[in-house]
Amino acid sequence: MSAVDVESRVRHQNFWFVACFAVLVIQIAVEYMMGRVPICACGYVKLWEGGVNTSGNSQHLSDWYTPSHIIHGFLFYGLAHLILRRKPLAAKLLLALVIESGWELLENSPLIIDRYRTATIALDYYGDSILNSAMDTVFMCVGFFFARRAPVALTVAIATFFEIFTGYIIRDNLTLNVVMLIWPVEAIKVWQGGV
């Protein structure tokens, strides 16, 4: 490979990574314009928020829903690998970031916030802080890069563990969240309310 080819390849890869960073910046800017709070209204930032039905949930760096975003990364890597097989890794990451950022914007819209509050146990959910939402996207990237390196069986095992563990501890996880958002089941809502 000639020096010109290497330089062209590096420039091409850099373009994709700049585009990835731009998606995250746009997500943050749009959430700010939507009126989302930058950090928790409590005025401080915690590494971990362990409460589920608390005012700090979805406001700090990580919480019980962080494993769901890591699983998003696993899933989005798989999708990108299938449909962008010949594209560079950064192009695959860009697809994952566009999907995750799109979800974060939708999740923090009045439509979805109201849906969560009426169909799930998240009665006091008012949306994520910008910091939490951005970290959700970063954790998706962690899952994406993990899935790229790890054997598929290990990735599936970790996703299964995350789902079972969070389901057991907080009676919620990615699967239950999707079910309750799309097709609420009263029995699940009652069970989740027992936390």
UniProtKB/Swiss-Prot annotation:
Keyword Cell membrane: yes
Membrane topology, as annotated: Multi-pass membrane protein
InterPro entries: DUF2585 (IPR019691)
TM helices/strands, residue ranges: 15-35, 64-84, 127-147, 150-170
Superkingdom of origin organism: Bacteria
Alphabetical list of Pfam families matching this protein: DUF2585
Recorded GO CC terms: plasma membrane
Key words, A-Z: Cell membrane, Membrane, Transmembrane, Transmembrane helix
Keyword check for Transmembrane: yes
Cell location: Cell membrane
Protein family per UniProt: Belongs to the UPF0314 family.
NCBIfam families, sorted: PRK00944.1
HAMAP family given in the database record: UPF0314
Protein name: UPF0314 protein RL4541
Lineage per the UniProt record: Bacteria, Pseudomonadati, Pseudomonadota, Alphaproteobacteria, Hyphomicrobiales
